[in-house]
Every structure is written in structure tokens, then in C-alpha cells.
Amino acid sequence: MFAAQEFVSPTLDWHALAPELVLVGTLVVVLLADLFLPEGRKGILPSLAGLGLLGSAIPVLTLAVDGADRSMFGGAYAVDNFALVLKALFLISGYVVVLLSTNYIAEGDYAEGEYYFLLLSSILGMTVIASARDLITIFVALELLSIPAYLLAGWRKNDVKGNEAGAKYYLMGVFATGVLLYGMSLLYGVAGSTLLSDIGAVLADGENLPIITLAIVFCVVGFGFKVSAVPFHTWAPDTYEGAPTPITAFLSVSSKAAGFVALAELILIAFAGQEAAYQPFLWVLAALTMTIGNMVALRQTNVVRMLAYSGVAQAGFILAPLAVAGDTDRSLSAIVSYLVIYAAMNLGAFAVVMAVARKTGSGEISSFSGVFEYSPLLAGLMGIFLFSLAGIPPLGGWQAKFFVFRAVVDAGDNWAYGLAVVMAINSVIALAYYANLARQMFMEPAPDGDTSPVHMPVSISAALVITAGLTVAFGVSPWAADLGDMSEFSTPVAAEPSPDEAASPDAVPLPPPATPTVLVPDLAPPFDPTLPDPSAPLPAASAVPVTP
């Protein structure tokens, strides 16, 4: 009645999943603490969130020391050098955002528990994206990142600009998600698989080129929204201005980096060998993004909007290595290095903006007049971040731009050289608006002669120490900024014992894994010996007389 049929359970590598598991545990702890702690003791919530992020970074470090590439779920989830570097970036950036949020959220009378729960949920989505090697995994991780971010962008419920920020971000995000999902469905229809490696193998045959090109365009457009590339950037300035400042910093760095990570995975794995289909589109996208972003940033009078358009221009630089047919490993290394350095200097710039706003109550560029008179340290730190964003040596931004220029020029064709010229021109344009803000701080007098000091919370001071230290360290130590093979894709394998461990006389052979069986009902009717055998041949027909 029942037949035994083999069922193979998936193998889980708990060490590889440890960063995400720690984050999930932190989510639960923060939510329970917010539920049961009295109102006066909820100040511990940012500490719990920060400790959880640092705790998640510990298994990232142990996995890096272990050095083994790991894969799970049929290759849909990989832990390699690329994934580990990006997980570390997301966790450290998230920790800095928690530091920036500590006093801002407490003093603004916001719901702290829900805020940190949503922030950690979004960071969890980013860590999953770093390991995603499958269309479904990428999409689910993007939604896990985006849905909490929509809510965080509109966190200031009683502010008109805050409501506008949340609404614009949500509506544009839903549209981009639909476009991206349609492109992914076309890829699945052509390849018959959601694994990026399988898609790359099928697309290499060169068949169904029109459908493949359409799928690539839809996917790039969908990710173009996530990274605020022109012309899909229109949500960014208004959202950045209306969202809480720590969330603005978070969206401008971590969220954008996650979008670039997913785009790089798709292009360099699934679209490998399809340069003719996507690189002309990406070339135009990169050139327009950096040029329009810089030109509009020149006209801004609000420092947050200026940094928003600066982020648009920086996105063009990060797209550049993908837009030319150069060395894939060098392009990937340049992108990851740029993302890491950009995170440090941009988060630092937003930390200074928050510190100055505590005194001036304004985000206008004119409110930065005379910062050097009442806080030389803040003015000096902002100068470091601004000139690093402009790519002035010997700061980290210089190294980031050098790696991108090198990856582009190494492609060695006219398209690459043309894009390098566009990048050089835009670097000069960007220096103009960064220098204008620096001039306000160092050369203009303080408004109304007010030179009273800025009172900075310890959390913002800690964020400034971390970001400034990394920005300077990446600049003076090129070996630290050039991630090289630390950011390369690799062919992940399941974790196995090393040869030395296997050959050891003390090694105990592991028993073969148990194969559970599932009882499947046998739908065939029971055998009855009194019934004729259905497999026996039919008897020969005999003539039967018919009586009229």
C-alpha cells in the first residue's frame, strides 16, 4: 500500500549562516525588550542593536580566517571572499548608523523599538544579498531590505517633507520592483533556472538574443532605481531631505551599496559574455549619472540635497567599471573598494551635518558659515570628508577613484578612454561644490557672531572617530584600500575537512548521513487472485452463429 521513496534533506552550514542568525536573534531581543521594558529603560535599545551588529561581525571574521568557500541550497547561497567583505561593510555601516540614531531618535520622541527593529531587518536583507547567487534569493533579500526602508524614510509622521519622502520612495520602489521582476522572469523563461551560474551558461549559447537583451535592460533599470542612477534618481533628493538624517545616511550608503552588489552579481555571473548587450547601455548610464548628478549638485543650497546629488554622481563612478569590457576581477575589486571607502567618508560627512545642526537647527549650506570659529575639530573633519569625496590625495577617496580609473583604462579601447575622460571632467566639477562648503566653514564668519561651542553626544563623536579613522587609513595605506582578491567571486563548495585532518590517524570517520524515508501512498489496487490477470493476452475471437 505504501512505497518507500528517498527524501534528501538540505545540508545546512551553521557557521556560514551565523551572521544572519545572530542578526535574527538581535531582532527578536530588541522587539521583546521594547515590549516588556518600562518607558524609562528603553534607552538600552540602541545598545542592544549595536551589540547585535558587532556580534554578527564576529562569525564574519571567523569565516574569513577559516578561508573555505561555502555553498548551500544548491548553489543559491554562497559565502566567499566577496560575500564576507560586503557583510563586514554592511554590519559596520549599520553600527555607525545606530550611533548616529541614538540621540536623534530619543530626543525626537520616536518609537525606538520599531525603529531599530526595522533598521536591523533592512541590514539583514543586505547581508543576504551579499551571499545571494540566485534570482529568487536576490529578489527576496532586496524586498527584505526595501520594505523596512520605505517605513524608515517616512518615520517623521508629523512632518510634511517626511511624508513626502516616504511616499515617493515607496511608489518609485514598487515601480522599480515590478520592472526588475519582469526582467528576472524573462531570464528564467530563457534559461529554465534561477541560479545565476546556470543562466550564464545558457546565455553563452547566443540564442534568443532579443529576449536576453530585453531582460538585461529591465534588470538594469530595476537596479538603477536602487542605486539612484540617472534618470531613475528622482526619488533620492526629496527622500534624503525628508527622511530622518540617520536614515538619509543609511540610504545613501548601505542601501545603495546593496543595490550595486546585486547588480554586480547579476552582470558578472549571469550576464558574463553578454557585454555587447549591456555595456553600451551601462556606458551611457554611467556618463549621464555622474554628469547630471554633479551639475545639479552645483546649484543646491541645502547640504543634505547637495550630498544626495553628490551620491548620484558617485553612483556613476561605481557603474563605470561595469560599463567597459575590462578585467572582471579588477573591475569587481574596484567596485567593492569604492563602496567601502565611500561608506566611510559619506557617513562621516552626515555625522558632521548632524553635529552642526544641533547648534544651528538648519541644514542649509549658509548655516555652516564660521564652523571653524566655534569648532575647529568639526571643520577639519568635514574638510577631510569633503576632499576625500572629491578624490584629493592622500585621502581614501583618492584611492577609490584611482582603482576605478585603473579598471576603466585597463579595458584598452576607445569607449574606455572616452569614459575615463568623462570621469576626469566630473572629478573637477565635483571639487567646486565641495570646496564651496569648505569655504563657508573656514572663510565666512559665524552668523550673528555666535561662537558658542557645539555640544556633541558621545555617540556622534564615536561615529566621527570611526569614519575619519577609516577615511585617512584608506588614503595613507593603499594596501588596505586595495581589496584585491579579497573581493573576488569564487567557486564555493560545501565545507569539508582539510586534507591534514582527514589523513590524521586520530581522525574518526564520520558515518554516512542518514537518509530519511517518506512513506508515499501506493495508489495501485490490491492484488486479487480471483480476478483475471490484466497483463495476460486476450483469448482469440471465435465465430458465434447468429440466429435470425
Show where each model-derived region lies.
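Alpha-helical transmembrane segments of multi-pass membrane proteins predominantly involved
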Residues: 1-548
